[in-house]
Amino acid sequence: MDTKLLDILACPICKGPLKLSADKTELISKGAGLAYPIRDGIPVMLESEARTLTTEERLDK
C-alpha cells in the first residue's frame, strides 16, 4: 500500500486518522478501536471487514 494514502484517508466510522500496522497488513483506527485489513495492497475500509482492537492494542502508543 502506498503510505502517501495515509495523508488523505480517514476512518469511515470516527473520521479520525489511520496508522499503518507494524507488519503493514492493517490500517489502525485508535478512535474507532478497529483494524481495517489491507488485501493485495488495497485497504478494505468496511466496518464489517474490520476487526476490533484488543485492549493492549488500544493502549499501545
UniProtKB/Swiss-Prot annotation:
GO terms for cellular component: cytosol. InterPro entries: Trm112-like (IPR005651). Belongs to the UPF0434 family. This is UPF0434 protein PFL_1779. It comes from Pseudomonas fluorescens (strain ATCC BAA-477 / NRRL B-23932 / Pf-5).
